[in-house]
């Protein structure tokens, strides 16, 4: 039996060795079809995207729409999407997910850039995959990490 999930997202429960977790197939299909490239956009697991105001959302979506031949994979809360459904539906090149396997997306050959908050894990995964970053630090160590990333030639802020 195939389950479109990831064991990391499941609670402890009885299971069977006949279950195969196949979560992430949708992002793989998007990336495979992104012949002109894809950009990953994530501010990590601690950032609450429901706090983004309408002006910020419109700015982000407007920028993404201008690059219609590039696919954008955005980690964004479903509440944010549902509250702004028309805006998200108007950009067929923007693909929203509440969760995805970030290293797998970064390691895909069609991933061209990573818009990130510069959390330590994101910076490390991006460097390992060789994907340039566009850093937008929000709090904590992210400001330092972003400076280190820029200094080391991993991207810009």
Kindly give the residue locations of the regions a language model identified:
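Catalytic core of nucleotide-sugar-dependent glycosyltransferases
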Residues: 1-157
């Amino acid at each position: 039996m195939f389950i479109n999930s990831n064991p990391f997202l499941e609670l402890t429960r009885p299971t069977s060795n006949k279950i195969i977790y196949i979560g992430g197939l949708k992002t793989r299909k998007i990336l495979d079809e992104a012949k002109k490239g894809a950009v990953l956009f994530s501010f990590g697991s601690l950032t609450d995207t429901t706090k983004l105001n309408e002006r910020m959302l419109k700015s982000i979506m407007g920028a993404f729409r201008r690059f219609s031949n590039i696919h954008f994979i955005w980690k964004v809360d479903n509440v944010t999407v549902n509250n702004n459904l028309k805006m998200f539906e108007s950009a067929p090149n923007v693909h929203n997910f509440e969760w995805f396997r970030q290293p797998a997306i970064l390691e895909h050959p069609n991933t061209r850039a990573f818009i990130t908050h510069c959390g330590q894990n994101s910076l490390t995964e991006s460097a390992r995959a060789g994907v340039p970053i566009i850093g937008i630090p929000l709090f904590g160590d992210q400001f330092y990490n972003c400076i280190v990333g820029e200094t080391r030639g991993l991207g810009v802020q």
